[in-house]
Amino acid sequence: MRLLVVAAALALSAGGASADKAAARRSINDKGTMRQCTDRGGKKSCRRVAVFQGHNAARSTLRTDPLDRPSGDVWVRAENLGEEFQGNIYKPDGSFDDAALAKLDDLWRDTRSGDVRAVRAELYEHLSRICDHFPGRRIDLVSGFRFHERDSSRHFHASAMDIRIKEVSIRELYSFAETLDIGSEGALGIGLYPVSQFIHVDFRAPGEPSYRWTDWSGHDGGKKSPGRTQPARKPVS
């Protein structure tokens, strides 16, 4: 049933962005549910649905073939900082360019405290794959490392990013991100935020399951719902 809920959300038309934003006006109560109405054939039907809907990704939906190595090209702008990076994360010999990674780490820094933490290089490789898939488009970073986040968050462990791309629907971005999930040693958590208009992508510790969710709460959605996602373990090298 949960799979059907998420599938239905992804099946909405490209014009669904304004409808998604209108969801912020729906009544969200303290129990983590909201009133959602549909109009079919002139008949209006309303029900209360969970603001947060999540599930482990089915193994059958995960990628079975190895991921191609990305070009390494990255173009990303941190929205809250007004700073951007455009360059390559690899050296000519194919190894990681530590100077480029350091610049990205700085872009990922906590916007409240200014703290910087080394971000998982695998996350930057996924960022490059997204850039390769949407050539010529800049990725906007909504949130990266968050020092003040609870330690169960992947943002706290510097292994997550909230992103969007101008003129690319978040559903299209979400769908492509799903193709990057190989499970097992490279599991991803991927979340869709229709009201705030971004997706979340995180790199998970070995043995953690791939996870998918849709969160209808907005920036003013109140406290987070209990059980909204699984506790994070710090990814290890």
Give the label of every model feature segment.
Residues M1-P70, H219-S237:
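N-terminal secretory targeting signals
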Residues D20-N29, M34-T38, R77, S152-M161, ...:
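Catalytic cores and adjacent binding grooves of peptidoglycan-active enzymes
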Residues P70-G72, A100-D105, P135-R137, S159, ...:
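Envelope-exposed proteins and targeting segments
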Residues G72, W108-R120, A160-K166, P209:
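Second-shell loop/turn segments in exported
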Residues A78-N80, I89-K91, S143-R146, I165-E167, ...:
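A mature extracytoplasmic/lumenal domain signature
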Residues N80-L81, F85-G136:
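Active-site acidic/histidine clusters and adjacent loop/turn architecture
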Residues D98-A99, V142-A160:
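Short, surface-exposed glycine/acidic/tryptophan-bearing loops
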Residues D115-A118, G136-F145, A187-P194:
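Surface-exposed patches in mature extracellular/periplasmic domains of secreted proteins
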